[in-house]
């Protein structure tokens, strides 16, 4: 782990050294010039998928942090600075590293950056993380096929492991679960841990699960995904084992 500063930019890398191109790593234009952009996905902004296995050991996803809602129309990507470790990208980096070290199937964090404005009051943020290969988000997959009972149970066990660590995924929904096709079968991953973190007690855990169920029910109507009450029963049975 290597943390350093260049002028008004702060970096953390999951390596024991720095890179001359540290700042360029967080610019899509740099990767486009290198002809290393291998795909992209649209959300609040564009996430770029990068061919970086020869540099970082894995291919990466590059994401810039954008605000949502009405506030996002007035201020699309600036956040108030209070402490480095609580900035959006550094906080997500450290949480992903904690979960990765605990053995949960989450993307390995590669690097994070914040860039302060001239007055040092606000900052912009970016993160580089592992790209999960041969994977689709659950909603895309469920538009074309059903999942086995074992895969639904795998999702339930995964969420239980997360909750046992007292980590609340505040945006737990069907889009933030990836299903990867491997030689051993389907493997489920959790992604997008922005604004997530540790939460004490247990009252919130069923609320978190119910949030996930509502997202499935919403996508049944919106995207015509294949989801049944039996699927949910299999998921929750594994969660409660």
Predicted segments with their positions:
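Conserved catalytic-loop position in the HRD/HxD motif
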Residues: 166, 171
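Short, low-complexity Ser/Thr-rich regulatory SLiMs
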Residues: 116, 179-183
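AlphaC helix of the protein kinase catalytic domain
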Residues: 137-145
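Conserved alphaE helix
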Residues: 150-158
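Hydrophobic residue at the +6 position relative to the catalytic HRD Asp in the kinase catalytic loop
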Residues: 172-179
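Conserved ATP-binding subdomain of kinase catalytic cores across diverse folds
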Residues: 25-136, 160, 164
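Juxta-kinase regulatory segment immediately upstream of eukaryotic protein kinase catalytic domains
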Residues: 1-38
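C-lobe/activation-segment region of protein kinase-like
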Residues: 182-241
């Amino acid at each position: 782990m290597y943390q350093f500063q260049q002028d008004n930019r702060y970096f953390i890398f999951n390596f024991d050294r720095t890179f001359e191109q540290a700042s360029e790593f967080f610019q899509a234009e740099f990767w486009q010039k290198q002809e290393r952009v291998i795909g992209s996905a649209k959300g609040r902004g564009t996430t770029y998928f990068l061919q970086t296995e020869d540099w970082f050991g894995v291919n990466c996803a590059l994401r810039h942090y954008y605000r949502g809602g009405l506030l996002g129309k007035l201020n699309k990507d600036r956040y108030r600075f209070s402490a480095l470790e609580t900035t959006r990208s550094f906080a997500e980096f450290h949480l992903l590293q904690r979960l990765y070290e605990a053995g949960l199937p989450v993307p390995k964090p590669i690097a994070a950056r914040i860039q302060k404005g001239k007055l040092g009051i606000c900052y912009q943020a970016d993160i580089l993380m592992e790209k999960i290969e041969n994977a689709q988000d659950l909603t895309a997959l469920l538009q074309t096929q059903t999942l086995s009972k074992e895969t639904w149970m795998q999702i339930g066990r995964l969420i239980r492991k997360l909750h046992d660590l007292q980590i609340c995924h505040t945006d737990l929904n069907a889009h933030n679960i990836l299903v990867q096709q491997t030689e051993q079968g389907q493997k489920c991953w959790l992604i997008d841990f922005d604004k997530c973190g540790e939460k004490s007690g247990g009252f919130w855990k069923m609320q978190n699960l119910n949030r996930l169920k509502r997202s499935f029910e919403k996508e049944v109507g919106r995207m015509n995904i294949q989801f049944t009450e039996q699927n949910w029963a299999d998921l929750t049975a594994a969660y409660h084992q």
